[in-house]
Amino acid sequence: WRFSACSGHFGGSMDGAALGLVEAPKTWHVAEFKTHNAKSFKALIEKGVQASKPMHYSQMQIYMHLSGMVRAYYMAVNKDDDSLYAERIHYDQPHAEALLANAASIIKANEPPEGISTNAGWYECKWCDYHSLCFEQTLPEQNCRTCLHSTPAANGLWHCEATAQMGEPPYLSADDQKQGCSMHLFIPALIKGIAVDACPDGEWVEYEQDGKTIRNKAGGTWG
């Protein structure tokens, strides 16, 4: 039950498909099963899936869109007392298409999207695992996904312009992407500074940071 979109760069696996439900016995349903704590479960009962768990709702809309099904069945269990909640969800085509368009725009973007807040103390930022990347001078991991030479290609592949210019195979395996290489240069938007200069041969990019000039050299080194 796995589906993909956006040239193989976006996808997921739904939990299952259900047929024979009392409300619509002849209609196939995307089936999703989730666990909740007591607080989350209470909100789910009071507000429904779309309002209380918009990510779960969007997940089912994507699966309905990609599978061709027009209904989803959401089953939730309260892990504190094993009580159950079920809800049938109708397919919302505009919502699903908007989600896929947003995913495609992020995949194809040359820079990461803006953060949810510029306030380091904002609660969603404060507890985020990547807080230091947004609000401190911590560098991201050095791999192909953080390198300005790589771009998404068809069939879920990634293309390296640096290796292509050297006449080597340009498409990157999953292992290649995780490891990076000696030609790595960070995407400028990931650096806490202003890009002010770059080598025409792609060997370095210079930044101004706190009144100083620093140079990101190929391979992730600095000088």
What are these regions (language model features)?
Residues 43-57, 62-167, 175-223:
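Metal-dependent nuclease catalytic regions and adjoining charged, substrate-binding loops involved
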Residues 1-9, 15:
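A short acidic/basic microdomain associated with nuclease active sites
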Residues 7-9, 26, 165:
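Glycine-centered tight beta-turn/hairpin loop motif at sheet-sheet or coil-to-beta transitions
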Residues 12-47, 63:
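Conserved catalytic cores of phosphodiester-cleaving nucleases, focusing on short active-site segments
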